[in-house]
Structures are given as C-alpha cells and as structure tokens.
Regions:
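Active-site entrance/lid segments in N-terminal catalytic domains of soluble metabolic enzymes
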Residues: 1-163, 196-201
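A glycine-rich phosphate-binding loop feature that marks nucleotide/adenosyl-phosphate handling sites
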Residues: 54, 109-113, 170-181
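A short, small-residue-rich loop immediately preceding and capping a beta-strand
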Residues: 99-101, 166-173
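Gly/Ser/Thr/Ala-enriched C-terminal appendages of enzymes
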Residues: 143-144, 148, 162, 176-180, ...
Length: 213
C-alpha cells in the first residue's frame, strides 16, 4: 500500500489515501497489534483521534497499552462524536484508562492549562508549522511555533507551581534541523516530535514520502 501511495502524483495521492482509509478500523486488529508488541517486550503506545477514542473507549480501557496519545489537529477538553451526540470528556478518559494520556495539539496558554487540569500527562504543541500540515491553508488557523511553545510552557510552569505536578511539553511541527530542536528547547519544550528527517531515512516505510492530516 505504501509503495502504491508513493508512486502516484501530488494531485492523486489524497483521493487514493481516502479510498484506502475508508475501510473501517477493526477492533480485533487493534488488540492483536497491542498484544504483538507486548509479547515482544515492547512499549505499546496507541494513538487515536478524539472520535476514535469515543468509538473504541471500551477497547482502550481493556487493552494492555502503556500510554495513549490523543491526537487531533486541534484538541480541547470536550469533543463531540461523529453522530453529533456522544461526547469525549478528556478528564474522564484520563481517569478510566489508568495509563498516561498525552494530548494535543494545542497552542495557547488557556487550552494548555485546561488540558493539564483535566489530567493529561503530556502536551503536544503546534498547529500549522509542520511540513505536511495544511491547517493554516485549509482552516486558516495556526500560531508560530516559538510563540506556541513559549505560551504553553508558561502554563506548564504556572500549573507546576500551583499543583506540584509537572506536565512535559512536546514541540510538534516544523522541526527539521538540530537548530530547530534547540529553539524549541530554548522556548520551553521538554521534547520534540519530528517527521521529515525520519521520513527521509533509508529504513522509512514511506520510501521518503510522508503525508499530513
């Protein structure tokens, strides 16, 4: 499948990926992959959108995952499901999973503070700066990464002073060089996520290509 995606032109890969990913997620396959990782002694980190967390909440609660990444273009403390009725309460999710929940993405002091108060163990920060991200062009939203990390790390520090609980900040987006990493750390990030350099490596499954949300 990855070879098929990487072989088509820029105007063709989105419809192709939509077709491929239209296949419903199989609940049994989620558990199977988690068990495969655990049997080999690995750390099972599961990633899902807020909508997926709503749909597969029971699977998450009953699985053997070590941590869960709640990932969306923009994440807040309450999300509405695909049916427009069922909601995901992040505080309840953090309490029910019994494993660390890392949430994102966010870019403001206010939202970072709300997510930390909800119980997340880590925050992913960044909307728009990624090489494969289309948020600024499609949605018209986004904040420069240095500003976003500075604001969210300020919320982290204030929250730590008030509660004694430290929530790491992960810079996510637009981080390609060692200089980019240093800038993020200087602005207050505890760690970074990188995509482009890894996607370009010889062992990457996408053959040098990568695709955004």
């Amino acid at each position: 499948i990855l070879r098929q995606i990487s072989s088509v032109g820029k105007s063709e890969f989105v419809p192709l990926m939509q077709k491929i990913y239209s296949e419903p997620i199989k609940e049994s396959l989620i558990l199977q992959r988690i068990n495969d990782i655990k049997e080999k002694g690995g750390i099972a980190a599961l990633s899902g959108t807020p909508q997926a967390a709503i749909k597969f909440k029971e699977t998450l609660v009953n699985s053997k995952i070590d941590l869960f990444f709640l990932q969306g273009t923009v994440v807040s403390t309450m999300h509405i499901g695909m049916d427009g009725k069922e909601t995901l309460n992040i505080k309840s999710l953090c309490q029910s999973l019994k494993v660390p929940v890392v949430a994102g993405n966010c870019v403001t002091y206010e939202v970072a503070e709300l997510l930390m108060k909800a119980g997340v163990a880590g925050l992913m920060v960044g909307i728009g700066p990624g090489a494969a991200c289309t948020s600024r062009g499609v949605l018209g939203i986004g904040i420069p990464q240095a500003t976003a990390i500075s604001d969210c790390s300020s919320a982290r520090d204030d929250y730590f002073k008030a509660t004694g609980r430290y929530v790491p900040i992960i810079g996510d987006g637009g981080i390609i060089t060692g200089g980019d990493i240093c800038k993020c750390l200087a602005c207050g990030a505890d760690a970074v996520m990188i995509g482009s350099p890894i996607a370009k490596s010889s062992s990457a499954p996408g053959y040098g290509f990568h695709w955004g949300m």
